[in-house]
Amino acid sequence: MSVMFDPQAAIYPFPPKPTPLNDDEKQFYREKIKRLLKERNAVMVAHYYTDPEIQQLAEETGGCISDSLEMARFGAKHAASTLLVAGVRFMGETAKILSPAKTILMPTLAAECSLDLGCPIDEFSAFCDAHPDRTVVVYANTSAAVKARADWVVTSSIAVELIEHLDSLGEKIIWAPDRHLGNYVQKQTGADVLCWQGACIVHDEFKTQALTRLKKIYPDAALLVHPESPQSIVEMADAVGSTSQLIKAAKTLPHRQLIVATDRGIFYKMQQAVPEKELLEAPTAGEGATCRSCAHCPWMAMNGLKAIAEGLEQGGAAHEIQVDAALREGALLPLNRMLDFATTLRA
């Protein structure tokens, strides 16, 4: 008897935390990375959720700090022949799909994502086959194989608009892998959405009880929430959006204190945007509960200075992203559909 994969029941082992570096070691690796970037004709692209010192280095070396899609876009347009992707593995894959001629290096290929892990291709493909009348929309936080099985790829920044568009065409949707984001777009659009039941281990930990207590301590604070969070958290929010949208909301909201319900890595760029405001972490533990991620992705934390230097210096199978040519072609189609759709939204 076969047992259907249950993303909600899956427990993913966390990687060990990187060994802390002292100030001299940090300076040594910073200088080494700067030298290696020049020698390899490389540029560094980092996600908002990496540690502040990694984002700072990306800025100092002319790189990019953004969400996964903009990271890949930046890399595709940049003249560098090599991209150093500080993030998790699917981000490196997306960069390779959009820039096949470039060398894509990562500090470690073991930097996973619970959304990616929670959507294995064989089980997901069978799920799609069981609902052949539905259009398959997958979040960017998926493997190249899952993207290749989809009709559309989407980021949180345009998810609502895309589902509205598909709903206007009378299409029924399979959404994967994040159930919270899928439920959010369904409620925003009223579309017929069948959700795969994955979740982000960071956002899934935000707790309403603890958040309510924090709001009592800071009654004048606005709450900014990423839509990968549970519905009960989203319903408390003053602003809901992707990483880039939350940074914009921090600038436009009049509140002097902001409670932020997403990975705390975003605080680096958000504080730059609003230096006069106080940023507060939304709690990830409730009554009698403890947190596993504690508002920081453990795989993002693998992108340390030493690992980045090793990735640039060593390259090879331990650090270079490869995507099968057939998979790349399959994944490029839904990615390009998304890019074209995003362009029409800006027009």
Swiss-Prot record:
UniProt-listed Enzyme Commission number(s): 2.5.1.72
Pfam families: NadA (PF02445)
Residues that coordinate or bind [4Fe-4S] cluster: C113, C200, C297
SUPFAM superfamilies listed in its UniProt record: NadA-like
Subcellular location: Cytoplasm
Recorded GO CC terms: cytosol
Pathway where it operates: Cofactor biosynthesis; NAD(+) biosynthesis; quinolinate from iminoaspartate: step 1/1
Highest taxon in the source lineage: Bacteria
Catalytic reaction equation(s): iminosuccinate + dihydroxyacetone phosphate = quinolinate + phosphate + 2 H2O + H(+)
Keywords linked to the UniProt accession: 4Fe-4S, Cytoplasm, Iron, Iron-sulfur, Metal-binding, Pyridine nucleotide biosynthesis, Transferase
Gene3D superfamilies: NadA-like
Record bears the keyword Electron transport: no
GO terms, biological process: 'de novo' NAD biosynthetic process from L-aspartate
Cofactors: [4Fe-4S] cluster
GO-annotated molecular function: 4 iron, 4 sulfur cluster binding; metal ion binding; quinolinate synthetase A activity
Residues engaged in binding iminosuccinate: H47, S68, Y139, A140, N141, S156, H226, P227, E228, T243
Family stated for the protein in its record: Belongs to the quinolinate synthase family. Type 1 subfamily.
Function as written in the Swiss-Prot or TrEMBL entry: Catalyzes the condensation of iminoaspartate with dihydroxyacetone phosphate to form quinolinate.
Name of the protein in its database record: Quinolinate synthase
Taxonomic lineage: Bacteria, Pseudomonadati, Pseudomonadota, Gammaproteobacteria, Enterobacterales
